[in-house]
């Protein structure tokens, strides 16, 4: 066993002696949660055909959580659960049709701020194959919002 391994074993043993009261007294850390490439089939677009037939939409999200107890407690209930965030975003994106990505991103941002403990949210929606008559790889819209602090 290498000497570094002995040091690591000692550190791990020391961690086992660390109790919950010590953890709660430790300084908190600012946390940002990012979700990249959430791919959903949706019905958004200016044309009736886009809204009827639908298309793949890719969403990227960033939530500024601020101080987060989970950095110390290691408990998912002490942070924003990114699986729940993805489920909520999918619900907003798929429950109705919007003509513009701007409105869709705004609706998602509003829902995230209302439902999760985030100080700021950033939402980017990308259409990988936009229905325009020019060679374009993708189009996207970004919306950034801050919590009202209530």
Q: Language model features by range: what are they?
A:
Residues 1-150:
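N-terminal, polar/charged subdomain of small-to-medium soluble alpha/beta proteins
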């Amino acid at each position: 066993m290498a000497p570094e391994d002995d040091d690591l074993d000692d550190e791990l043993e020391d961690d086992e002696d660390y109790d919950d009261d010590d953890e709660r007294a430790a300084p908190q850390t600012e946390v940002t949660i990012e979700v990249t490439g959430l791919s959903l089939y949706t019905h958004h677009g200016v044309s009736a055909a886009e809204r009827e037939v639908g298309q793949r939409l890719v969403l990227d999200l960033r939530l500024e959580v601020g101080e987060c107890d989970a950095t110390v407690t290691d408990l998912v209930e002490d942070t924003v659960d990114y699986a729940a965030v993805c489920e909520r975003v999918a619900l907003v994106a798929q429950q109705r049709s919007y003509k513009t990505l701007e409105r869709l991103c705004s609706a998602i941002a509003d829902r995230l701020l209302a439902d999760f403990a985030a100080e700021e949210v950033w939402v980017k929606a990308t259409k990988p194959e936009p229905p325009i008559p020019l060679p374009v790889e993708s189009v996207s819209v970004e919306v950034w919002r801050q919590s009202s602090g209530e």
